[in-house]
Amino acid sequence: MKAIITVIGKDKVGIIAGVSSILAEMKINILDISQTIMQEYFTMIMLTDLSCSVVSFDKVKTELDEKGKKLGVSIKIQDEGIFNSMNRV
């Protein structure tokens, strides 16, 4: 299963490291990543592969939400199919 993860918040040291380390702990592979800083705001979108994940999708969602709170950013995850359906032009 592939999923899209978005991260948005005020820029500070450790956001990418914090998100990527928790994904690695859950055996989630980052297939593609794009990040940008817009003035003082950090934005990142990742395409991930959960096929080897050691936890359920709901657990991944919970863990990312908790990590986001610790980092002071919003982290959202969506199934790639749902993301594509919602963002089709």
Curated annotation (Swiss-Prot):
Pfam families: ACT_6
Domain ACT, chain residue ranges per copy: 4-78
Gene3D superfamilies: 3.30.70.260
Coiled coil: none
Family affiliation: Belongs to the UPF0237 family.
Protein name: UPF0237 protein CA_C0478
Organism, as annotated: Clostridium acetobutylicum (strain ATCC 824 / DSM 792 / JCM 1419 / IAM 19013 / LMG 5710 / NBRC 13948 / NRRL B-527 / VKM B-1787 / 2291 / W)
